[in-house]
Regions:
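Structured catalytic-domain cores with a bias toward divalent-metal coordination
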Residues: 1-162
Length: 163
C-alpha cells in the first residue's frame, strides 16, 4: 500500500513520522508561533479497496488539552463537504483511528474544518443582510481583515470570535 499524506493547504497540520504497511505514525505540529498544539487536518491519497489503515498520533499526550481525548472521535470526509465522526481510541498517550473506506482520497481532522474561504463566504453573506452594519477593525498578524458586525441597538453587547 502506497499512501501519500499531505497537509499543505489552508488549515492543514500534521507531520508524518513513518509508515509500515497499514500503520501510519503521525505527530501534530505546534500552532503557528506557539508552544501549543491540538489541531490536525490532513489528506490521504492511495486509499481504497477496503484495506484498513490505522493512523496513530503519537504526541497526543502533549497536546494543549490531553484530557479531551478520551471519548473523542476524529472527523473524516471523502468530499470535504460531509464530515462524519469515526471511532477513535486514546491509549497510553496515543490517539488512534482506523479507515477502510472505498474512496481513494480522504481527509481527516480534529473537527470539521472552517477554512478562510468559508469565513469569507460567511462575511459576504452576513454583510448583505438588512439591518447589519459591517466594519473592518484592522488586520490580523497574518494580514487578514478583522471584521465586525453591528446588529440591533440594545444595551447589551456580545462579542464572538472563532476560527
Amino acid at each position: 500500500m502506497s499512501l501519500t499524506i499531505n497537509s499543505a493547504f489552508d488549515g492543514g497540520n500534521i507531520r508524518v513520522i513513518g509508515q509500515d504497511g497499514g500503520k501510519v505514525d503521525l505527530e501534530i505540529v505546534n500552532d503557528h508561533q506557539s508552544d501549543f498544539y491540538q489541531w490536525f487536518y490532513f489528506r490521504v491519497a492511495g486509499l481504497g479497496g477496503g484495506e484498513r489503515v490505522t493512523f496513530r498520533i503519537l504526541n497526543a499526550a502533549g497536546s494543549a488539552y490531553p484530557f479531551g481525548w478520551p471519548g473523542y472521535q476524529a472527523r473524516a470526509s471523502v468530499d470535504r463537504v460531509d464530515w462524519r465522526m469515526i471511532p477513535t481510541r486514546y491509549e497510553n498517550g496515543v490517539l488512534e483511528f482506523d479507515w477502510s473506506g472505498d474512496a481513494q482520497v480522504a481527509w481527516f481532522a480534529y473537527f470539521a474544518p472552517f477554512t478562510m474561504e468559508m469565513h469569507a463566504d460567511l462575511i459576504a453573506r452576513i454583510a448583505r443582510r438588512p439591518g447589519v452594519a459591517h466594519r473592518e477593525l484592522g488586520l490580523s498578524l497574518d494580514g487578514q481583515p478583522i471584521d465586525a458586525f453591528t446588529l440591533g441597538s440594545g444595551a447589551k453587547q456580545v462579542w464572538l470570535y472563532a476560527r
